[in-house]
Design a protein with these regions (language model features):
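A short, acidic, amphipathic alpha-helical segment used as a generic capping/interface helix at domain edges
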Residues: 85-87, 213-232
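Redox- and metal-dependent alpha/beta enzyme cores, enriched for Fe-S-associated oxidoreductases
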Residues: 62, 141-145, 151-211
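Local cysteine-cluster metal-coordination motifs and their immediate loop/turn environment
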Residues: 34-36, 64-75, 103-110, 159-168, ...
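Short Fe-S-cluster ligation motifs
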Residues: 1-8, 222-247, 267-271
């Protein structure tokens, strides 16, 4: 399909020449990013690719299942949500992987870990599931990778996506990464599970028909939070948040770039 062709072209572009040999089956890790982290914001995927290359870890992606976003969850269609999820599980089994790593997408991780795995939709699975933030934070804590924070010298902050922070309790892991990778990390107030929503959650960020509401009402508190930090970069591990925050910064004429947590790893990792 055209989607598969597009994915293959982009993955070819963002990987080094010596990394372009496809791993089809038997890889240790199966990486499932949101499509935005391949098509729009590849730096996040490139950050993980550098880690895997450095440590000699075998990993793969699928041209059949390459978007961790689950649109059944977005639209409230439970049957579609489970069907979408099952396709990824069948692909993971076909690839004979040992670990599944959902990328910087909180609602994808919420479905894989807290809905599918814990409720055993498909019974016991022959692989474990840990999101990319847990994976990288664990490597930093063990000293397996080294980051040069001087390569990210400008003030940065972290936005807690609702699904990661409130629904899944992933709060400390991204901060471990950001503090190790950035020379000037600044915290929002409030933060963690009490951080303000970006104003574009639940797919609202895709609705430009209500742009004025999103920019001036739903996103008002988040804009104020970012401004108070003085940061010039906001890490937001969520495709919805990235779009909403990018539009907020443009609308309010703030010179702030939006990206992912692994964008900082991509810059800072010592190979």
């Amino acid at each position: 399909s055209r989607n598969e062709m597009a994915l293959k072209v982009i993955v070819y572009f963002v990987t080094a020449p010596n990394e372009r040999e496809a791993v089809l089956k038997g890889a240790d890790y199966f990486y499932v990013p949101p499509s935005g982290d391949v098509l729009v914001n590849p730096e996040a995927t490139m950050g993980l690719a550098k880690i895997m290359h450095l440590l000699g870890i075998s990993w793969t992606m699928s041209s059949k299942c390459f978007d961790g976003a689950n649109y059944g969850l977005f639209t409230g269609d439970d049957a579609a949500m489970k069907a979408d999820n099952k396709a990824y599980i069948e692909e993971a089994k076909r690839l004979k992987i040992k670990h599944m790593i959902p990328g910087e997408c909180g609602h994808a991780y919420r479905i894989f870990k807290y809905m599918m795995e814990k409720q055993q939709w498909w019974g016991d699975l022959p692989f474990d599931i840990a999101n990319v933030l847990e994976f990288t934070a664990g490597l930093i804590k063990k000293g397996a990778i080294k980051l040069d924070k001087i390569r990210n010298p400008n003030p940065v902050t972290y936005h807690d996506p609702c699904n990661f922070g409130r629904s899944c309790g992933i709060v400390e892991e991204p901060r471990i990464i950001m503090k190790a990778a950035c020379a000037d990390y600044r915290e929002m107030t409030p933060s963690g599970s009490k951080n303000w929503c970006c104003g574009g959650g639940g797919g609202l960020s895709a609705m430009d028909t209500i742009l004025d509401f999103r920019m001036n009402v739903a996103g008002k508190k988040k804009t104020e939070q970012i401004k108070e930090t003085g940061a010039t970069f906001v890490a937001a591990p969520c495709a919805n948040c990235k779009r909403q925050l990018t539009q907020l910064m443009e609308h309010h004429k703030m010179d702030v770039k939006i990206g992912g947590v692994h964008d900082m790893v991509f810059n800072a990792i010592i190979l």
